[in-house]
Amino acid sequence: MFNSEIKEKYLDTLSEGMVMQMRPIFAKAEITETLYNKDIYDFTSMQILELIRSFDQTTIGSVRRTLALLSLYIDWAISYKLSKGLTNLARTISEEELYECLGDKKLYITYSELEEMENQLVNYQSKAVLRLLFEGVSGLAHSELLSLTKKQVEDAMLNGNVLTLYDSKHGERKLKVSSECLVIALNAAQETKYKLKNGKAKGQTKEVFLVENDYVVKTKRTSNKGDGQASKFVITNLITDISEFFKINFLTPNTIVRSGHLYRAYQLYKEKGVIDNSVRYQIIDDFNLRVKSKYRAVYSMQDYINEEEVNKYYAEELGLKETTI
């Protein structure tokens, strides 16, 4: 479990029946908590909803129950001053938002959808963020993505496509990516303008100038000084713009990262004919994921790295049925 000492203290306060309900929730939440590098009690309301959606529950009753259990845990954390805030954001979630968490809804994009989206995006800034997240570049507060420079991309092109990434908390990490990813990132580093609304802006301002520097992800040029590394909000804004253009409400950095994991699972499924823990361990190694415990990470990955999900998202590629994207 993420932040296991705190969670075990909470479980010690519960009845045996409640522990049996909470422990699986904590176990399944570990991947999402690790990606955001924070405990559930510090999640935003949107992150809480994303977590609930990842459970893929099929009845509104089960969704409500999960929210109620999460709310109790957050209340406890606030009462012991563990949370950074004083408001339980789980209690601000509406019934309408809960219905949107019901299972059998699309949570991830496939590789073919990624390519189709890239073809329709006019800004390399957008293409780069989408592709880099899909191939596993993220880090604490997206620091690997935000610190990525043109030189790092060029070095990777000369070193078997292996990027040297820098996380603000965990330091250096190596990750092998595709040639397509590097080409897109290089183009983004050379981009000087950003077309608003993916080139469909109707106002007087249709494009903005970007700061000219060596970073792949850039901020808008303003009269204020600050031409260095962009903030994490630039990533949020880029993903929001992509979501709005394609009318995709589930797109977040986390779901894009998981989409990349699922694509790798599909590739391994074609090779092995099965999705088991060896496949999940392979994905952890291929993406060089930072996890405290591989065993626990593999357990958490079972929710989305399984044959049902692979068959659901890659049915056409596997010849199971015809699908329309």
Swiss-Prot record:
GO terms for molecular function: DNA binding. It holds the Pfam family MrpR_C_cat. SUPFAM superfamilies: DNA breaking-rejoining enzymes. It comes from Bacillus subtilis (strain 168). It comes from the Bacteria. This is SPbeta prophage-derived uncharacterized protein YopR. The lineage of its organism: Bacteria, Bacillati, Bacillota, Bacilli, Bacillales. The gene is yopR.
